[in-house]
Design a protein with these regions (language model features):
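N-terminal low-complexity, intrinsically disordered segments
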Residues: 1-84
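Low-complexity intrinsically disordered segments
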Residues: 89-146
Length: 146
């Protein structure tokens, strides 16, 4: 008897691997900025999440994920490791998708997402120096004046 691999099972494995990769990237970013995720401000958390959404785009392109898979991966990333509620994650993911496809909707967030695409490449190439510089420049630019 021949065992067949269920396409749904393969899909689950691909998404689980992508989710793990995103978590590792967020962990690495937090190490590089010297602040655990749970100690970041809400603004920093949102910036890192938008940056991570750029990584979702990179993974989607690399792994040829369909739109529903990319959406699910985005929501998964916002729930874990960012600890947004399911509804917050859905709403935030929808906002990120809108902003990513319309620069004029929120130019700063659009730029952060696109820098996250570069950040994903830096993470995969183990370019910690480039990744640290990338995220630190963004965080410095969005910090409110004191």
């Amino acid at each position: 008897m021949t065992d067949f691999i269920n396409a749904e099972d393969i899909n689950d494995v691909i998404l689980a691997a992508a989710a793990s990769e995103l978590e590792q990237m967020v962990d690495r970013i937090c190490e590089l900025i010297g602040t655990p995720l749970e100690q970041t401000t809400e603004l920093e958390r949102q910036v890192i999440a938008a940056f991570g959404f750029g990584a979702v785009y990179g993974i989607t392109h690399r792994d040829q994920l369909a739109e529903p898979q990319a959406h699910a991966l985005s929501i998964r990333m916002l729930i874990k490791p960012f600890n947004y509620s399911e509804q917050q994650a859905v709403d935030f993911a929808d906002d990120l998708i809108r902003v990513a496809s319309d620069r004029e909707a929120h130019p700063v967030m659009n730029t952060i997402i696109h820098r996250g695409i570069d950040g994903h490449r830096q993470f995969n190439q183990e370019d910690d120096e480039g990744l640290a510089r990338n995220i630190q420049e963004i965080l410095a630019a969005v910090q409110p004046e004191r």
